[in-house]
Amino acid sequence: AVFHLMTHAFFKALLFLGAGSVIMGMHHDQDMRNMGGLWKYMPITWLTSLIGSLALIGTPFFSGFYSKDSIIEAVAESHIYGSGFAHFAVMAGVFITAFYSFRMYFLVFHGKERFGQPHDDHGHGHDDHDAHDDHHGLAPGQKPHESPWVVTLPLVMLAIPSVIVGYFAIEPMLFGEFFNGAIFVNLEQHHAMKELAEAFHGPVAMALHSLHSPVLYLALGGVVTAAVFYLWLPQIPAFFARVLAPVKNVLDNKYYLDDFNQAVFAKGARVLGAGLWKGADQGLIDGLVVNGSAKLVGWFSGSVRKVQSGYLYHYAFAMILGLIGLITWILYTHLGSIK
């Protein structure tokens, strides 16, 4: 698994960067149904994407083959509980991976040119991001272009290890001392690894042996099926799209996960934020603590200010009342002390 993680990093990064190069060449259009025939306009991206796809599906002598086939063989030789279902799952994954990888490859780089036309509504999500993306793409009559060297150079640099790194790394990483005890595998308890080590006779022999393996034919079947569906007989997937329209609608809307996230998380966050803003910030903090104390001082000052009328007889009257009150207090306290 660690070996496959390493090889997978190269060709999956290559495919992601290739996708970014295509998006740049298409002026940010990300819908494969608006592409086709890009190989003649983006030759470096086309070739490196082909290399990445071949490595991803486990083509013999490519890096993905050595790590992927090792996992498949290890699962086939395993006798632990559930290994039979695991083997079925990985074999099905071989076909599915080859199918969807070359579906992308054929739709983007081969077939009829579908760019430079007004975009139809393909039923994608209806959030703001998708609405914004609808304004991108090639104008009518405009052609795609290859990406600049700052993009194509990394594509080439990633394509090289996608081809050769598995060939040179399989023996030291799986059967040698590459990890030097950092990863310990008890071969007595893991018979699959022990049998793989005994059957390994070099990377060339391993690749040649796979030429009559069902894994290779499943991968080829996926590639051929993708070619039939999306190059030679596109009416077949169109027929299934009509027959399975409800399923297609769910898939086009990405299982409605974007709508769910928008309605629950995004809208919920906005409602919560508005409540905290109006209730806690404006109501409690600003309204009661900050502005409330200021209003209290203002109210008290306004009340006291009413005493300051500006009329002299009011002040004289207040002084007389004060003097009467002072005399009363003195007499009260003095008489009380005499008693």
What are these regions (language model features)?
Residues 171-218, 228-339:
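Aromatic-capped, Gly/Pro-kinked transmembrane alpha-helices
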Residues 8, 35, 64, 105, ...:
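Divalent metal-coordination and catalytic microenvironments
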Residues 26-62, 85-93, 119, 123-164, ...:
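Interfacial and helix-entry/exit segments of alpha-helical transmembrane bundles
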Residues 54-70, 158-177, 271:
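Alpha-helical transmembrane segments and their membrane-interface junctions
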Residues 1-2, 76-87, 335-339:
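Helix-coil boundary and interhelical linker segments in multi-pass alpha-helical membrane proteins
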Residues 12, 16, 87-142, 218-241:
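Predominantly late transmembrane helices and immediately cytosolic-facing juxtamembrane segments
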Residues 115, 124-137, 141-223:
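Hard-cation-handling environments
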Residues 1-80:
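Hydrophobic, small-residue-rich alpha-helical packing segments that form membrane-like cores
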